A protein has these predicted regions:
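Conserved active-site histidine-acidic residue motif and adjacent donor-binding/catalytic loop
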Residues: 1
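Flexible loop/turn connectors
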Residues: 9, 13-118
């Protein structure tokens, strides 16, 4: 949260060069960006849109739009793969642990994003 707050405050500090939207690499950074915008007197999403990535449970509280990357499912699949490897007598499985797994993502639109206002 703190890193997102500091970075957003720096980006939004000069209104002449301020962006219309911020993409954050994690929801926690997004929470900080929303707070920084509010502390600078900006309205989210009227003045600045904020979107992040994770699908953190607190995202709903903050109204943060997010790209939910199914982290719980990813962790469960990783644990299952590890158990399979540890319990296997198959030398091929033990020697070839690289595996490509794709996950669906969900765009969760909440109140932190809006279309850019027209001038």
């Amino acid at each position: 949260v703190g890193g997102g707050y500091v970075a957003a405050k720096q980006m939004l500090g000069d209104p002449r060069n301020a962006p219309t939207a911020i993409y954050c690499a994690s929801d926690e950074m997004g929470f900080g960006a929303i707070q920084a915008a509010r502390d600078l007197g900006l309205r989210v999403p009227q003045d600045i849109s904020v979107i992040a990535m994770d699908g953190h449970p607190m995202g709903e509280f903050y109204g943060l739009s997010t790209i939910d990357q199914q982290t719980n499912a990813q962790g469960a699949r990783g644990a299952d793969m590890l158990v399979d490897i540890l319990e296997s007598d198959d030398a091929k499985l033990l020697n070839n642990v690289e595996q490509l797994t794709t996950w669906p993502i969900d765009l969760v639109v909440r109140s932190s994003t809006a279309r850019q206002a027209t001038s």
